[in-house]
């Protein structure tokens, strides 16, 4: 082996060691600073509007005596906006808003397909909700809709059933 070949090999090994040492120092520095603060994902204007309507619906229902249990429960079938308790009844709430009533309004937007998705989602989430809040017994279930149109909230209790 020639001296040039050995010099090149030595130089590459030295550079690799320096890179590794630099990585270790950076990792130690990051560890000393602690974990990065968790950032909430930025919401689109539509998502912010939806969250505001859900907040209003939650205040409306809590003011009527319902007890909030969960919010925005996701499952593979979809999402349930609000989960409330009304005495011994589990109340699953869909919040809908429409700025323009031209196409039937907010309440009418909970059509057959949306109701079917909510029913599938409820069937998937019900065992866990019953275990957590009703000691494992399946409670009576009611589906309510809170519809926002023209700045007004309409609460439709028992909009449809299981």
UniProtKB/Swiss-Prot annotation:
Low complexity: compositionally biased ranges: 33-48
GO molecular function: nucleic acid binding
Entry coiled-coil feature ranges: none
TM region positions: none
Annotated spans, Disordered: 15-52
Domain of life: Bacteria
Biased composition (Basic residues): 20-32
Pfam families per the UniProt record, alphabetical: UPF0102 (PF02021)
Similarity field: Belongs to the UPF0102 family.
Protein name stated in the entry: UPF0102 protein Bpet0439
Native source organism of the sequence: Bordetella petrii (strain ATCC BAA-461 / DSM 12804 / CCUG 43448)
């Amino acid at each position: 082996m020639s001296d040039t070949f050995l010099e090149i090999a030595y130089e590459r090994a030295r550079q690799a060691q320096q890179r590794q040492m630099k990585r270790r120092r950076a990792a130690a520095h990051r560890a000393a600073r602690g974990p990065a603060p968790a950032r909430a994902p930025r919401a689109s204007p539509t998502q912010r509007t939806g969250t505001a309507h859900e907040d209003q619906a939650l205040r409306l229902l809590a003011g009527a005596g319902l007890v909030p249990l969960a919010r925005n429960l996701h499952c593979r079938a979809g999402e349930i906006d609000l989960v409330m308790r009304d005495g011994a009844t589990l109340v699953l709430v869909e919040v809908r808003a429409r700025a323009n009533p031209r196409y039937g309004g907010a309440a009418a937007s909970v059509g057959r397909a949306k109701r079917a998705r909510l029913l599938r989602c409820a069937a998937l989430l019900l065992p866990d909700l019953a275990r957590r809040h009703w000691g494992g017994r399946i409670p009576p279930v009611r589906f309510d809709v809170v519809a926002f149109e023209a700045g007004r909230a309409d609460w439709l209790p028992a909009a449809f059933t299981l």
